């Protein structure tokens, strides 16, 4: 009995241990162009829209108390038609942890992630999604870059592939509030999988390329008017048929 109680206490202690954090990660990091930086200049949660930077790039921010934010702006080449390259913008934020094996795990707030894919040569123009994907980096390094003499962050994807190095641009970090920004009753899927759902874009970039004709109500396309017209035509046809078959039609 004593052994069981001891095991229960030990288990409770393990579950109460907070996730490991690394103060060396604190700050805002950006790739060499420094044109893509986390914060309100990249994604505006009030208007629910992206603001297109001058150049492509990646940015990550981390806080001392375990929160992260990411900003992606990438070009997607089209090998068969180079003039029809696409672009992708992506925002996520949430909590991070450093695992015992040295991996870095980013767990986003499921309802807040956004992704915009612009395809100028496709009829739909742009697609705007709610986006949720947990990210796992096999390892990371924080060091002083020998050439630029500034702090550099090296991230290695889950399979060990290195990402473009990022450099410290802000400390303390430049971020949006570390809380759910767009609460909704129906959260998108969680876990280490990607969940996309279409949603209206609002008033931001590429909205004019994704407009669809509105449906008229009250004109010829009103289904109620077509229904009543059908009823009247049926009645008229029925009366004409009865009259043609009646014995007094020749009187």
Curated annotation (Swiss-Prot):
Q: Which residues lie on this side of the membrane: Cytoplasmic?
A: 247-251
Region span, Disordered: 184-218
Topological domains, Lumenal: 20-225
Cellular compartments annotated: Endoplasmic reticulum membrane
Q: Which residues cross the membrane?
A: 226-246
Q: What does this protein do?
A: Required for normal levels of the cell wall 1,6-beta-glucan. Involved in a protein folding machinery chaperoning proteins acting in various physiological processes including cell wall synthesis and lysis of autophagic bodies.
In this protein, the residues bearing a glycan are 101, 132
Q: Which Pfam families match?
A: Rot1
What does the entry give for GO biological process? 'de novo' protein folding
Q: Which GO terms describe its cellular component?
A: endoplasmic reticulum membrane
Q: Which residue ranges have biased composition labelled Polar residues?
A: 205-218
PANTHER family assigned to the protein according to its UniProt record, in alphabetical order? PROTEIN ROT1
Residues spanning the signal sequence: 1-19
Membrane topology is:
Single-pass type I membrane protein
What are the protein's GO molecular function terms?
Answer: unfolded protein binding
> Family, per the entry?
Belongs to the ROT1 family.
Which UniProt keyword terms apply here?
A: Endoplasmic reticulum, Glycoprotein, Membrane, Signal, Transmembrane, Transmembrane helix
Q: What is this protein called?
A: Protein ROT1
Q: Matching InterPro entries, A to Z?
A: Rot1
Q: Mainly resides where?
A: endoplasmic reticulum
**Taxonomy, superkingdom:** Eukaryota
